[in-house]
Amino acid sequence: MKNLYFLRHAKSSWDDYTLKDFDRPLSTRGIQDADLMGNFFKSKRAKIDIILASPSKRTIETIEHFFGNKAPDVKFDESIYHASLDDVLKNIYAVPEEVSSVMVVGHNPSMHDATEFLTQKFLNKFPTCGLASLNTENKWNDLNRGSAELNYFMKPRELR
C-alpha cells in the first residue's frame, strides 16, 4: 500500500503588492492554518518519506509550519509551481518504487485536479491548506484515473 498526500499551500499575504506571486509569504491566518493542519496530521501518525514541492515562498513556509523542525526530505521542483495535472503526475511517476509515502505541496488548481483525477471523487473546493490523503496499491509510475482511494480530505475550517 502506498500513501499519497496533496497539501495546498496555506493562505498567502497580499500586504506587499510589489512582491512577485512566487515571493509572497504566508498571511497570519495562513501560518495559523499550517500549524493547525500540521497538528492534525501528526495526530494521524502518518509517515512521509519524501515531499515534492513548489519552491515558492508560501509553499516553503507552509512546509515549515506544517512539520515544524521535523520535515522529511523535500525535493523542490519548479514544475510544481503553476503545474498542470501532467506536471504533478510526472513528479510522482519519478518517485523511486521503494518510497511508500509521498506528499505533494503545491498550488491550485493542480492539487484539486490531481486528487479528483486519481480518486474520481468530486471535491467541491480545495481550500488553502486543504489536505487530501490517498491510498493506492499501484506503483508510482502506474498511477492513473481512479487508481487511488480517498482516505480523507481535511480543511482548516473544520479544525478551527
Give the positions of each predicted feature.
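Domain-level recognition of soluble alpha/beta enzyme cores
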Residues: 122-153
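Hydrophobic packing residues within well-ordered alpha-helices of enzyme cores
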Residues: 62-66, 88, 114-115
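Active-site-proximal alpha-helix that buttresses catalytic centers in soluble enzyme cores
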Residues: 2-3, 7-79, 83, 123-127, ...
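Non-DNA-binding regulatory cores of transcription-related proteins
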Residues: 95-98, 103, 108-129
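Short phosphate-binding loop-to-helix
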Residues: 80-96
